Curated annotation (Swiss-Prot):
GO terms for cellular component: cytosol; succinate-CoA ligase complex. Its EC number is 6.2.1.5. One of its GO terms (biological process) is succinyl-CoA metabolic process. Keywords: ATP-binding, Ligase, Magnesium, Metal-binding, Nucleotide-binding, Tricarboxylic acid cycle. The keyword Nucleotide-binding applies. This is Succinate--CoA ligase [ADP-forming] subunit beta. It is an enzyme of class 6 (ligase).
Amino acid sequence: MNIHEYQGKEIFRSMGVAVPNGSVAYTPEEAVEVAKGLKEGVYVVKAQIHAGGRGKAGGVKIAKSLDEVESYAKELLGKVLVTHQTGPEGKEVKRLLVEEGCDIKKEYYLGFVLDRATDSVVLMGSEEGGTEIEEVAEATPEKIFKEVIDPVVGLMPYQARRLAFNINIPKESVNKAVKIMLGLYDVFMKKDASIIEINPLVTTGDGEVLALDAKINFDANALFRQKDVMELRDLDEEDPKEIEASKYDLSYIALDGNIGCMVNGAGLAMATMDTINHFGGNPANFLDVGGGATKEKVTEAFKIILGDEKVEGIFVNIFGGIMKCDVIAEGVVAAAKELELTIPLVVRLEGTNVDQGKEILGNSGLAITPASTMAEGAQKIVELVKEAK
C-alpha cells in the first residue's frame, strides 16, 4: 500500500526524523493559509499523487510570495500530471503539500529495502541525490553504498555512521544524518514497511539535515495490524478494479494489454502472461484467484476483468490442487451466462476434479474453447482475439 508524501512526512516527524515544516492543502485558499503559518521567504508547493517524477513533470513549484503560492495552487489543483510512473493517462492532482523552502547545500539518496538475496533489510545511500536511483545504479553503481542489517540487533549506529561517511556527508552533519537513519529504520520496522526512500535527503546552509521527500510502501500482508496506516489509504489514487478485487481477496493488477487472465497462484499467473506474450499476445491483467476460490469469487473475478474495456478475450488457466476444477468450471459458466459473455474464452483445467470440471464446461452450451496445456491455451486465445477483430 502506498501513501502520499505529506502523510509519510507526518510519520517521519512523529518518529523524530527531521522534515521541513508544512501541511496539506485541498484548495488555493488553504494553500495560502498553510503558507501564512510558515517562515516567510521561499515556499514549496508540491502536487500529491502516488507517483514519482513529479518535479520533472511540473508538479513541484517554488513560490516567493503568498500570491505565487495561490497562483501555483490554482495551476496544480485539478491538473492531470503525467510522469514516467503514471503512464500516459496521468493522475489528477487533488491535494498539495505546502512547505518551507530551505537553503540546499547538497542532495543525497537514502533508502531502506528488503533484500531477498540476504534475507535482510538493507540501508542504501548515495551522494547522487535528486536523481532516479535506478539511473545511478546503471551509470555509476560504485556510488551506491549498502549496509546489511542484522534482524536480531537492528541497524547499529556504527553502520549508519559508516554509510554517512561513504556518501560524503560533512563531518559536522554526520550525527544528524545518523539520527535520521536510525529513525527511518524505526519507522520501517514498527510500521511494517516494504520500502522507504528519501530522495533527496539534504544538508542545508545552516547545518541541518532534512528529508525533503518521503516515499513509504507498506506490506499489504501486515495491514491487519496497522490500523493507523490503513486510515491513510487514498482510494482515489488506486485503480477501481484493484479496489474491487481486494474486497474479494483477489490479487489483481491492471496491465496495458487486451487478453484478460484468470489464474490460481502468482507463479502460474506470471508464467501464463509470459506464454501469452510468447505467442504474440498482450495480457490485460494479472489476476490470482488464490487457492480458496468459490463460485461467487470466480464470478466477481470475471466482472473485474470485463470492467476493463480493452479486454477482447479471456484465458482461464487453473491447476487444481487445493482449488477444485469443478468449482472453477461452475464459476466460469455462471459468470459467462450472467454477464452474457460475447468475447472469446479459452479455459485450461488440470488437477483435482478435472474431469468433472471439463464435463461442466462441455455441457454448458456456451462457446468455451478448451485447452489441454498452458501453451495451447495461450496460443488459442491469441489466435481467437486476432480473428475476432
